[in-house]
Amino acid sequence: MSFGGMFDGAGSGVFSYDAGGGGGGGGVHNSRLLPTPPVPKPGGGFAAPGLSLGLQTMDGSQLGDVNRSLAMMGNGGSGSGGDGDSLGRGREEENDSRSGSDNLDGASGDELDPDNSNPRKKKKRYHRHTPQQIQELEAVFKECPHPDEKQRMELSRRLNLESRQVKFWFQNRRTQMKQTQIERHENALLRQENDKLRAENMTIREAMRNPMCASCGGAAVLGEVSLEEQHLRIENARLKDELDRVCALAGKFLGRPISSISSPGPPSLQACSGLELGVGSNGGFGLGALGASAAMQSIPDLMGGSSGLTGGPVGSAAMRLPAGIGGLDGAMHAAAADGGAIDRAVLLELALAAMDELVKVAQMDEPLWLPSLDGGFETLNYDEYHRAFARVVGQCPAGYVSEATRESGIAIISSVDLVDSLMDAPRWSEMFPCVVARASTTDIISSGMGGTRSGSIQLMHAELQVLSPLVPIREVVFLRFCKQHAEGLWAVVDVSVDAVLRPDQNGGGGSSSSSYMGCRLLPTGCIVQDMNNGYSKVTWVVHAEYDETAAHQLYRPLLRSGQALGARRWLASLQRQCQYLAILCSNSLPARDHAAITPVGRRSMLKLAQRMTDNFCAGVCASAAQKWRRLDEWRGEGGGGGGGGGGDGEDKVRMMARHSVGAPGEPPGVVLSATTSVRLPGTLPQRVFDYLRDEQRRGDWDILANGEAMQEMDHIAKGQHHGNAVSLLRPNATSGNQNNMLILQETCTDSSGSLVVYAPVDVQSMHVVMNGGDSAYVSLLPSGFAILPDGHNNGASPSPAEVGSGASPNSAAGGGGGSNNTGSLVTVAFQILVNNLPTAKLTVESVDTVSNLLSCTIQKIKSALQASIISP
């Protein structure tokens, strides 16, 4: 960096060589400028040494002239004696104190005597210390920069030097170190001053673009340009050229052009090395050396103000940085949730380390990932993992267990569209409605570079759910980092920041309520690579630690298997949602769809079904998205039976209530939610799903069917699987109330689980929706079923819940089509309006009625499937 000749020729000093040997051996050092010894002045003061960066190398004669000139500047020294004595002593001390570089060689006694009658007639000869002498002196200096007289005598004897030479060598060596520190400090101050000048120039430039009159507020007419403004323009042009050169160097380092308009990083980070990214030889990609310094250089606007993403504001002002120019002290910290300060460099280092780990874990096979013998899930070899990677989120809290899964597949979505959905919290929730209960962006560390999402880092808060009241919600606060590694190749990684935000807490999550489960995300995310025809190959990795004791024992095998919130569920949900979006955007109708519905009506009906499913999931998991008031757990009658029921023969039902007042899309009054989960050992999830979505067998269990089959009026496909659809059902009952009622039903299924959600709607409202009307004001209360595998493998031993509840390890599952330990976990949830008055009080009779209805429905399903039931 040029400083415009600020230091050229400034100051004075003694120029010496910190080197040894004329042969250029290992002991040769670059020449340095040493400050002159203090020069006496008449007033007894001393001149401060100067600083010069521009002196050229001088030969011995020139050094002698300089020494003589310096000595002649004195005026008698500190003792008595004249100019001659002072000159002699100055020359002698300087000759003896040459930093191990110049030494007297073979000089006679007369030559060394300062009182010689003609000392200037004979030219003194000098030589350098040998490399061995310098090496020995340097070694001692590292151990003891201030040796005492005894140590100096020992060194002089061992190195064949005079004690005075050793003494002066150490003095000069200490002076060199001090001078280096001073230079570094001055350079740092100059860099800060340079940044301030840049900021001032930017302010002046903005003011010159739109000059305003201070008195009238109108446009000001520029007069004659002053001399000061001309200097500012010249300085501004010079700074711009310098910035362009820096951007060009950064572009060469990163392999992509860097705009000079981007705000520069803070001065302390300008010297950091860049992040090395490249395409790997195996078709994947790899990362070079990573660290916080790499992040600063590779993301130019990383330390700028907290600009928001397109499409929505940033959620919490508490985590927002003050907007401003990068490099200000305030831009280096974000406020923590508890009011503390977080160094952004720590967050950047965490994000980069997580990205490095995700890329490697997604690429590596054996011995890191061990294939299962039955062709199922891969297993992470934790011994190999701990050898290969350092922990990025601290030690695992006591009582937590780990889950690690990996899955790959093809999705009908481009890499850019998927990345945009993941980096936008509302779109992310819509993409995974059954997994993400709620999500928000707390802070934007970086909005990306070059107008893309590459380099974007966000601090996010999310609630992850398993559709059952027996599994608390996982609340996580994490960093999401997106990076483009090559053309059409992206990676998005999540990593918990609990250890940074709350270092005094061992557990993850931000709530101590029993409705939440402690959880920490280790590097988790996906690798997306574009393929032909709008498809992408997606590799999903989930690595988490959670408090298993918070979940009921019925669901612990499912959680341990990684099927509850593992990579397979994320990828399967993504594939199903992408198929739905592709059909929604298509102009052609699937073969199974009814042609009577217009395209606008189809979209309106699908939007209504999506709202119904979202409300169902929020009611099952008691997410904070809906304000439910939890009641005491009820015991329904007749939930068990068949030899496989719970220990007391009753179902444990979670009851919640809320008052709906003027909410669009909901009937006013008191809404009661009843939810329970049971296990059907030996009954496959697909069999349960096919039975529940069959309108011909609806009368077996649905009280709305009045014991009869239903007729499908309309059908809208949502995917390639015939089980992914939205249907409009009509009861075959003859009563007036039934004739005015229809059933809106949405069914979803994939390899991770299935969902059947339905709600009664009136005929007039559905006619409006099917003709393209707004569905936001259609009132409905959803009910339905969430079906998941139970997580038991063939031949596995029964869980403690089975043994404790009276289940027999050898009991057969009638009609289950599988072994005893392969079954389903079914969650049943009803939302019922128990009173039309929002101010009415909830009665015990209403709660008992809904609880008994839930238990009766489970009993009917059990009888129809000829299955045994294990209740919590």
Swiss-Prot record:
Its main location: nucleus. It is found in: Nucleus. Residues 28-53, 67-130, 792-818 are annotated as: Disordered. The keyword Kinase does not apply. One of its GO terms (molecular function) is DNA-binding transcription factor activity, RNA polymerase II-specific. InterPro entries: GLABRA2/ANL2/PDF2/ATML1-like, HD, Homeobox_CS, Homeodomain-like_sf, START-like_dom_sf, START_lipid-bd_dom. Residues 176-248 form a coiled coil. One of its GO terms (cellular component) is nucleus. Residues 86-99 have a biased composition (Basic and acidic residues). Residues 340-583 form the START domain. The keyword Nucleotidyltransferase does not apply. Residues 119-130 have a biased composition (Basic residues). Residues 74-85 have a biased composition (Gly residues). Residues 122-181 bind DNA. Gene3D superfamilies: 3.30.530.20, Homeodomain-like. Keywords: Coiled coil, DNA-binding, Homeobox, Nucleus, Transcription, Transcription regulation. Probable transcription factor. Belongs to the HD-ZIP homeobox family. Class IV subfamily. This is Homeobox-leucine zipper protein ROC6. The lineage of its organism: Eukaryota, Viridiplantae, Streptophyta, Embryophyta, Tracheophyta. The gene is ROC6.
